[in-house]
Amino acid sequence: MLFLARDVTHSTHLNTRSYAKHVALNEFYDGIIDLADKFAEAYQGKYGLIGPISLMSAKKTGNVVEFLEDQVEELMEMRYKVVEKECTPLQNIIDEIFGLYYSTLYKLKFLA
């Protein structure tokens, strides 16, 4: 899911004519990979190896804000299914991921 977000935002970043949008999306796709890696390593340290990761494909949408908002909803639904609430180190990384999404959404909605 996070790799898909990186691909969609990078593609949009390359095709936008808005400098503010270009910069916001650049920050997102650079940051999301670092956070995905950080989460995967910590998760595997606690639970063991994840195994093969299947790559998702994006639903057709021309609106990157809607795409990111949909991903936030999906992440909210999954967070306690993937990691128990009491595992605060991993939940903190998930919170960092949400922080990146929300910061990017702010920049796209109000600054771009």
Where are these regions (language model features)?
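Helix-loop segments that flank and shape redox-cofactor active sites
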Residues: 4-27, 82, 86-87
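Acidic/histidine-rich alpha-helical segments that form the ligand environment
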Residues: 55-109
